[in-house]
């Protein structure tokens, strides 16, 4: 599997390289892995379309299976499909919910109130309990703690994991 990853000259590049070095089945094509706080290649917000232009063009051109784009501090990410299309945070939340529900049947999944119906529909379809919530780290983490949710996602690209004590990663 070939993956192009853009870390926006943030801190994720060196860490991601070490991770991919341990998974020889994955071919990593790095973009902007050298940390540089001036962000010389493009802005750091993956939600801004102008910051995604290059990776959206490169993924299909280089026959990659997937593109991954991180913000500079590494607490948000989004994917680009093999045709170069951006996958919004709520759809990423729905996709990851499927994974968590396979591992934790009937689990609770928290998502932000701005998300489309795709999240709730996916969670229900695969036997989980969807709970929408106020936007923001503190609100999401509290709701996860109160309900025992295994996973949460926001359209901003923040994803939270019970295994990491509700922290976003």
Show where each model-derived region lies.
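Phosphate-binding chemistry for phosphorylated carbohydrates and sugar-nucleotides
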Residues: 1-169
